């Protein structure tokens, strides 16, 4: 008799054919909800359809089904992203001056859009240099393409087609994993496996393959481009990959192959994996050899991290154990119970991820200018300004989204009966202390930061410059920030003796880097003006946090409405006959938070735009004399409110206001139109629902009189719908106005 060890049971992780594919179902608007599927009685129907189409919680309470819908939707999202990327690459291939730009990136502007001559619109095709007429783009795609080693428009075509194939693949995957093989709930909740795959697969192998691409393709091609070789003469990527001798001519260590790696003689590879610091003086970007080295190191770290968590083999960390082992002196049972929250509430999980990703996006915004990663990015001022602004806005929206989903978690997924005395419960029990302290901090910051400006405006108006807070009178130097700058400027000598420069030129100490007579980067001086505006940043950020955090902590109950949880995430008032309870829902806090997020980000991008034009960007003469775009006026002008209005907003708006009849005229029209969109929002924000319902009823009366009344009854927007339309147009109008103002200005003077 043969004794066999018991066969390990294979877990079945998917359900086959759980939901049948039905085009009839898809074609029926509102098929996900019994009420909406009946069709419209009133115009409110179309709003409810939009509000609930993606609110999977409202379709079903089955967590597995919700998880599958979210998972499937992610593939749809990826499909759209690939489609968009394909379009970008196609524009580069078909409508751009990429090859011309590649041959002379300092004198030719990037353009990938040529306007057709319909009713005179061809005026928008400005001269970007090299005899090409088109719209100047500020997305940074040209710089990324050069860094990846793309040398021809044919390569862009091929990539665009590849992205289309991937878009189709993702669309198929979204259908397949919902209708054909849908994962079980246990699969979605297997966090250790998910961590291993995401860390080792996405981040580890992703970074490794990018490092490999850089070493074998980007570095040699960029080496040739920097030396002024014609792109058409440079060997193609596959020649570098297949022919080691080609690479060995540029990087001698390639001749030795993998021997140094296995004999641990790694320093041999220092010719293409460097640790220099600072910027490449030819391109004004980070050294690409530094970037390749960085991605290799990151890949190793994440490949190790992707083998740390316990899955099939019973070794490694369990996330639940790690969380529950965390106990501070004041936190009682510590993180006990958090694991269950994060594996059963996707809103809680999403909230954390949005907060982290939002913060990371803002970190990216600040690194794109201080450590410009791509060749010729630093001297393309329009792109620099656009990338900073874009990443700041995105980060702001993601962080507000984090608060929104935290509040939805509190209302829909939080179970107070099982959550006694865990960390979240302890936070909720002293929420009054948290919010009142935060409120005090906001009042303090608001009065003091604004007060410093008001003082300066008053002294300036009275003709008493010696009594102002400024670098030339009463100094308020940002000493801590200056200390951090100096520490980082001096750091390489002590901590990285092999590096030739510090991580960023902005820290100070180093010389400036100029490319083609334009400043790429130089040490950024900080003074009283920065100290003042920094405290406005502190103020606006704290108010945003106050509003959002109050919305989360009081989402389920408050002294005013103890049973708020029963009213849901969004409600206009606590019923008729209970005055003073309107606009207190968690949704309303997100609504208000969006306005303060807009304030906060606006001040940041204004600060950045003016500071860079005043103290960094400009031209360099043959003698090495730097002339900044606004001649260093930030330090003395931005210390009064009047200075911001006169020397920044008004002075720099001249380009967009006077753009008519030039290739920048579209920005003038957008500037005007976006102001209108913004003003349109006020109509929704300042007037009540009753006004519109009354107006509608008299219009309906006229229609009935003429016997042209529709079957669907018109209804005024609900209070919440009105506020949603209002905030959307407020933000859209404000952001588009700022975009037009920034770009018309920087394309004209940069």
Swiss-Prot record:
Q: Which reaction does it catalyse?
A: reduced [plastocyanin] + hnu + oxidized [2Fe-2S]-[ferredoxin] = oxidized [plastocyanin] + reduced [2Fe-2S]-[ferredoxin]
> What residues does phylloquinone bind to?
692
Stretches that traverse the bilayer? 70-93, 156-179, 195-219, 291-309, 346-369, 385-411, 433-455, 531-549, 589-610, 664-686, 724-744
Q: Where is [4Fe-4S] cluster annotated to bind?
A: 573, 582
Q: How is the cofactor bound?
A: P700 is a chlorophyll a/chlorophyll a' dimer, A0 is one or more chlorophyll a, A1 is one or both phylloquinones and FX is a shared 4Fe-4S iron-sulfur center.
Q: Enumerate the InterPro entries for this protein.
A: PSI_PsaA (IPR006243), PSI_PsaA/B (IPR001280), PSI_PsaA/B_CS (IPR020586), PSI_PsaA/B_sf (IPR036408)
User: Which residues make up the binding site for chlorophyll a?
Assistant: 683, 691
Binding-site positions, chlorophyll a': 675
Q: Name one GO biological process term.
A: photosynthesis
Q: What is its EC number?
A: 1.97.1.12
Please give an example of a GO cellular component term from this record.
Answer: photosystem I
Give the enzyme's main class according to its UniProt record, as a single word.
Answer: oxidoreductase
Going by the UniProt record, its keywords in alphabetical order are: 4Fe-4S, Chlorophyll, Chloroplast, Chromophore, Electron transport, Iron, Iron-sulfur, Magnesium, Membrane, Metal-binding, Oxidoreductase, Photosynthesis, Photosystem I, Plastid, Thylakoid, Transmembrane, Transmembrane helix, Transport
List the SUPFAM superfamilies hit by this protein, alphabetically: Photosystem I subunits PsaA/PsaB
Q: How does it sit in the membrane?
A: Multi-pass membrane protein
Query: Localized where?
Result: Plastid, Chloroplast thylakoid membrane
Q: What is its main location?
A: plastid
The UniProt GO MF terms for this protein read: 4 iron, 4 sulfur cluster binding; chlorophyll binding; electron transfer activity; magnesium ion binding; oxidoreductase activity
Regarding protein family, the annotation reads: Belongs to the PsaA/PsaB family.
Q: So what does this one do?
A: PsaA and PsaB bind P700, the primary electron donor of photosystem I (PSI), as well as the electron acceptors A0, A1 and FX. PSI is a plastocyanin-ferredoxin oxidoreductase, converting photonic excitation into a charge separation, which transfers an electron from the donor P700 chlorophyll pair to the spectroscopically characterized acceptors A0, A1, FX, FA and FB in turn. Oxidized P700 is reduced on the lumenal side of the thylakoid membrane by plastocyanin.
SUBUNIT field:
The PsaA/B heterodimer binds the P700 chlorophyll special pair and subsequent electron acceptors. PSI consists of a core antenna complex that captures photons, and an electron transfer chain that converts photonic excitation into a charge separation. The eukaryotic PSI reaction center is composed of at least 11 subunits.
HAMAP family documented for this protein: PSI_PsaA
This chain belongs to which protein, by name? Photosystem I P700 chlorophyll a apoprotein A1
